[in-house]
């Protein structure tokens, strides 16, 4: 599943494939999405808060 987040490092929209997200965790600067290749994206999207991302990832893994 693809979603559009606001990338906190460049402050611009970025498409992210949630199938490649290994884990997520909240931090002071946003929600960190650890990708399967080890890359870390920082989402500052108000549309996808931590709880909503957890819910989406749980549903997509089933």
Enumerate the predicted regions with their spans.
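Acidic, Ser/Thr- and proline-rich intrinsically disordered linker/docking segments
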Residues: 1-14, 20-62
